[in-house]
C-alpha cells in the first residue's frame, strides 16, 4: 500500500528505511550469517516487514551458495501444501456465493470469509447453507470490541474452523474472555508479532490457533520460532498471505511445509493476484501447491520483468 492503512508499514516507507537505515547497518558486517541479521537490526524499532525482506534476501543468497532449499533449512516435512482462499466483503450475498462457488470449483480446500459489523451472521449463514460441510472460517481484522462478545458467540451455530482476530491487536485479555465464552476456536493474526507474543497469548488462553505471516513477524526465522513454540504447546498454525509475488509465495510454501502447519493457508495461485508474476506462476493442483525444491527460495524472478 502507498499509505499506512493496514499497518504502520507501507511500501514507500519500507523502501526508504531499507535504503537509509537497514541495508547500511549490515554493510559493515562482512560475511553475515543470516541468523544474525535480526540481532544486528534489533536496535531499530519496528519495520518488521522491511527487516523480513532483507533477512530473506540474505538467507536466500546464503542457501543458494550451499545448494540448500529453504524448505530443507527450515525443517519441512511435506512436498506440497493444502491451499485456502480469502474472500473479501462483496456488495451482495449473491455476489459472495458466486465468488465462493468459483473458488471451490478452482479446487481450494478452505474458504475464509472477511466479516465486519453488518456483514457477519447472514453471509456466513448463506455460505454454510449453500455449500454445506466445507472447511469454513472467518476473519474480522479486529473489527469488533469486547461489547460484541455475545454477538460473536452467535457464530458458533455455523461450525467454523476458526474466528480470526476478532478484537484489537493489543487486546489479549479481551480475546481470552471471548475464548471462554464461545466454542469457535480463536485464531490470532495481528496480535502475534514474535514468539514472545505467541507465548503470552497461549498462556492467557487468548487463542487456540495462530496465523503466521512472515512479513508481520520479521521473517522466516522468527516464523519458525513461532511455529516451534506453538507446536510445543499443541497449538496449530497456518500461513497467512500478504499479496506476495512468486518470490514471497515460494518462501511461504517452504514455511507452510513444516509439521505444525496443519491447517490450509492463504497461499492462493499466482493468477488470483497477477496477470504476469515476477516468477513462473504457482498453480493450484488438486487443492495443493508444490513446495519449491531448488536452492534458496527455489525460484528466481524474470530479469526482464524487473526492469
Regions found by a protein language model. Name each.
Residues 1-9, 84-89, 241:
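Glycine-rich phosphate/pyrophosphate-binding beta-alpha loops
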Residues 1-65:
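Metal- or metallocofactor-binding catalytic centers and their adjacent structured scaffolds
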Residues 19-23, 55, 59-60, 125-128, ...:
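Predominant activation on well-ordered alpha-helical scaffold segments within soluble catalytic domains
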Residues 22, 54, 67, 111, ...:
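Conserved, mostly hydrophobic/aromatic
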Residues 38-42, 64, 68-80, 282-284, ...:
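N-terminal amphipathic alpha-helix/helix-capping segment at the start of soluble metabolic enzymes
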Residues 71-182:
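Metal-dependent enolase-superfamily TIM-barrel catalytic cores that perform enediolate-based chemistry
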Residues 170-187, 192-288, 292:
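Shared catalytic-loop signature of beta/alpha-barrel
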Residues 297-307:
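Extended hydrophobic packing segments that form well-structured cores
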Amino acid at each position: 500500500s502507498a499509505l499506512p492503512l493496514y499497518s504502520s508499514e507501507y511500501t514507500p516507507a519500507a523502501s526508504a528505511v531499507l535504503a537509509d537505515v537497514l541495508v547500511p547497518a549490515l554493510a559493515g558486517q562482512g560475511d553475515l550469517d543470516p541468523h544474525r541479521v535480526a540481532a544486528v537490526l534489533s536496535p531499530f524499532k519496528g519495520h518488521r516487514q522491511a527487516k523480513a525482506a532483507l533477512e530473506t534476501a540474505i538467507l536466500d543468497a546464503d542457501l543458494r551458495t550451499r545448494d540448500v532449499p529453504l524448505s530443507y533449512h527450515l525443517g519441512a516435512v511435506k512436498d506440497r501444501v493444502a491451499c485456502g482462499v480469502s474472500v473479501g466483503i462483496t456488495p451482495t450475498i449473491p455476489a459472495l456465493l458466486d465468488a465462493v462457488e468459483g473458488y471451490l470449483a478452482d479446487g481450494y480446500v478452505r474458504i475464509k470469509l472477511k466479516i465486519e459489523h453488518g456483514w457477519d451472521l447472514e453471509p456466513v449463514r448463506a455460505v454454510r447453507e449453500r455449500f454445506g460441510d466445507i472447511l469454513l472460517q472467518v476473519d474480522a481484522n479486529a473489527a469488533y470490541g469486547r461489547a460484541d462478545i455475545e454477538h460473536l458467540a452467535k457464530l458458533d451455530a455455523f461450525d467454523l474452523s476458526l474466528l480470526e482476530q476478532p478484537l484489537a491487536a493489543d487486546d489479549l485479555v479481551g480475546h481470552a474472555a471471548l475464548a471462554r465464552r464461545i466454542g469457535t476456536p480463536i485464531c490470532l493474526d495481528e496480535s502475534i508479532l514474535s514468539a514472545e507474543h505467541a507465548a503470552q497469548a497461549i498462556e492467557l488462553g487468548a487463542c487456540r490457533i495462530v496465523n503466521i505471516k512472515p512479513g508481520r513477524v520479521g521473517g522466516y526465522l522468527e516464523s519458525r520460532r513461532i511455529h516451534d513454540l506453538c507446536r510445543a504447546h499443541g497449538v496449530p498454525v497456518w500461513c497467512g498471505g500478504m499479496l506476495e509475488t512468486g518470490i514471497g509465495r515460494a518462501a511461504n510454501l517452504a514455511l507452510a511445509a513444516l509439521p505444525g502447519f496443519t491447517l490450509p493457508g492463504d497461499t492462493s495461485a499466482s493468477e488470483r493476484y497477477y496477470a504476469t508474476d515476477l516468477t513462473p506462476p504457482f498453480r493450484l493442483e488438486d487443492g495443493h501447491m508444490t513446495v519449491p525444491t531448488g536452492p534458496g527460495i527455489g525460484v528466481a524472478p524474470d530479469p526482464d520483468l524487473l526492469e
